[in-house]
């Protein structure tokens, strides 16, 4: 566990989402050594009530002069270490809406020993006090922001500790190899020979496990943040019409004037539990119109960040040089679907106006945004790309921070290939192995500086 010094201040924050007219109950959470004392000072509880742990008390929070009541409340006392943070925790459950909640919080913060909690600070304390592992705390935050059931399921797995145990076991295997090697460096003559090939094979096996986690992380990120699908193509091919149809909304303006769309527009649907955001963009062409030019430059920026690009062309008039030129300009590392639109206007000869190499592509779908013909094929393609078949069996998903560290670990382990091929002495193996072990330690939080930890938790929401 980490060995940071225990925190002194008592912290307080609103723990529930509050807005006027919404939520009949809200909770304020106080954690730290003066949590109970402070609470006793601001509430009147009738009769003799017991402030012992895991009990609920009934009472009223008073104004500062103790003459008037701010609200009628329930108070939940959890004495450390038997609490979420491991410190003394008091929750005050008051009426919802913003005014009572804020007045009570202000009343609490007026005590010099209490200050407002930073975002994520309750969870950070839970980690520092050994109540939660880092990846568990991160998973709690992911559960809070989950937008689909699958995302919630993955977050629960993380809360149960599956990321922590998986990474720890990989890290342990690396430590075993490092220990063997270091023993050879220190006491070569007393120990049986260590076979380089044997060590290399174990590292290959570890890399395979890590790689699986890295692949899963990509699918996990679709589940969590959804899939961004950018629609592009020449002006007037029907990008906006297609987005409107897929999202069953008349969100984008559609006219027969080329260059209608300028601002980037987004519309979300949920496909088999995965949020899919369609992004409608300005049609690509050379133009002197200043506004359209800005729109086109935004289109290009959007395309780089898409998970999938749909290139639309007008199937009824055929594949043109402009379509070809757009195709060539698309970022090559992003999956592409080509959609021939306006099939309702075509006759039997339309396919002759489209080159064979385009027609033969398996990522080609012919549709009509007007009649809806072919829409099912398009949806099926998207499902194949991101639907439940892709996320079936997915039970562990690293977040972005964890993924970066897993990738850095991979890089360090890959360096060892060179060390092996060049038959370098054992000292060289230890450099990259130690680096890999450190990365995984940063991932699990076992090897982490205080400032890195601050940085991770600052991204949590307030009161978490
Ligand atoms: N009202 C409320 N609901 C909540 C939370 C909270 O802080 N307050 N949680 C916050 O995220 C989650 C639950 N997490 C919690 C984790 C541990 C303890 C706790 O008191 N643990 C003690 C007692 C367990 C026992 O009696 O066996 C312990 O572990 O020792 C409480 C809540 C979700 N619901
Ligand atoms: N017949 C037919 N017309 C369509 C179809 N899809 C779009 N249109 C028409 O084509 C014209 C252009 O449609 P938009 O959706 O505005 O095309 P766009 O690609 O968004 O155009 P820009 O935003 O200007 O780049 C409109 O008149 C639409 O009604 C289709 O499948 N069949
Ligand atoms: K148009
Ligand atoms: Mg448009």
From Swiss-Prot:
- What GO cellular component entries does it have? cytosol
Q: A GO molecular-function term, please?
A: metal ion binding
Q: Does the keyword Acyltransferase apply?
A: no
| Residues the record lists as binding (6S)-5-formyl-5,6,7,8-tetrahydrofolate | 29, 91, 131, 464
Q: Where are the transmembrane segments?
A: none
Task: Please give the name of this protein.
Answer: tRNA modification GTPase MnmE
Q: Which NCBIfam families match?
A: mnmE_trmE_thdF, PRK05291.1-3, small_GTP
Q: Which domain of life is it from?
A: Bacteria
The residues covered by the TrmE-type G domain are 226-387
PANTHER family membership: TRNA MODIFICATION GTPASE GTPBP3, TRNA MODIFICATION GTPASE GTPBP3, MITOCHONDRIAL
User: Where does the chain bind Mg(2+)?
Assistant: 240, 261
Looking up Gene3D superfamilies in the UniProt record yields: P-loop containing nucleotide triphosphate hydrolases, Probable tRNA modification gtpase trme, domain 1, tRNA modification GTPase MnmE domain 2
Checking SUPFAM superfamilies in the record gives:
P-loop containing nucleoside triphosphate hydrolases
The entry's free-text remark on the cofactor is: Binds 1 potassium ion per subunit.
Protein family per UniProt: Belongs to the TRAFAC class TrmE-Era-EngA-EngB-Septin-like GTPase superfamily. TrmE GTPase family.
